[in-house]
Amino acid sequence: SLSDKDKAAVKAIWNKISKSADVIGADAMGRMLVVYPQTKTYFSHWSDLSPNSAPVKNHGKTVMTGVALAVSNIDDMTTGLKALSEKHAFQLRVDPSNFKILSHCILVVIAMMYPKDFTPEAHVSMDKFFCGLSLALAEKYR
């Protein structure tokens, strides 16, 4: 679980990167679809799955809106992300292992865009945060 120090670190990093959230999300989505091509099955209804396509960029923005929601509910992500968990479990039927894949891609992009801020300590806190976020999204699968 996240310590108070982790929560403070996540909030500090989010405060710094949130202005670029759309770019981070778009890049992370594009990377996920290229590096983990099996994830494309969830987006087969999109006309263009290339990294810079409009659907990929738009979904990246949507994903980062969810990350913002998780940051704002950092003390209880399971409750705060309940509706998103239900949507992904019952409507979209996304395999919850994909949450970890996309989380990793987001961490990679943050590290590339903010190398001075993404210290080893920040990395640990953000990784723990995304593990918690993934777990919260997987809650309705049980």
Swiss-Prot record:
One of its GO terms (molecular function) is haptoglobin binding. This fish has just a single hemoglobin. It displays a weak Bohr effect that is not effector-enhanced and shows a propensity to form disulfide-linked polymers in vitro. Keywords: Acetylation, Heme, Iron, Metal-binding, Oxygen transport, Transport. GO terms for biological process: hydrogen peroxide catabolic process; oxygen transport. Heme b binds at residues 59, 88. Belongs to the globin family. GO terms for cellular component: blood microparticle; haptoglobin-hemoglobin complex; hemoglobin complex. Heterotetramer of two alpha chains and two beta chains. It holds the Pfam family Globin. Red blood cells. The modification N-acetylserine is found at residue 1. This is Hemoglobin subunit alpha. Residues 1-142 form the Globin domain. Involved in oxygen transport from gills to the various peripheral tissues. It comes from the Eukaryota.
